[in-house]
Amino acid sequence: ESVAILADQNTPRTERVNLPFLGEEARIPTSLARFALKTDSPILPVFLLREGPERFRLVALAPIEPGKYADSEAGLGDLTAEVAAAMETGITYAPAQWFWVHRRWRAKHQPRQLIPGAPPPPPWGGETRP
């Protein structure tokens, strides 16, 4: 049996760690690592690459074995870091195909204030909201 998990989704604060990701510290979900450690299931990182109209290629990286992290106190964070490195591999291979809608780097990158003394722009990006 297999389970597919989108490992780059945003999660609650208690279910993520801050790790280097694409050159900056980012919030990385620990849920995939928790699941793998709890079930002793290998993680198979896969990426679907668009090659043309209605044409895709599935790329699989080497499996990540959770067993080597099971007895470590830092195991959850270390396994999460290995998952993040696998995501980086797929993203940097075809960066134009990575679609991200969450603010992964939100802690570091706050909106710039364009006019000194003016309030920051609304979080939804519009001028006004009913």
Q: Each predicted region: which residue ranges?
A:
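Non-catalytic C-terminal accessory region of glycerolipid acyltransferases
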Residues: 1-130
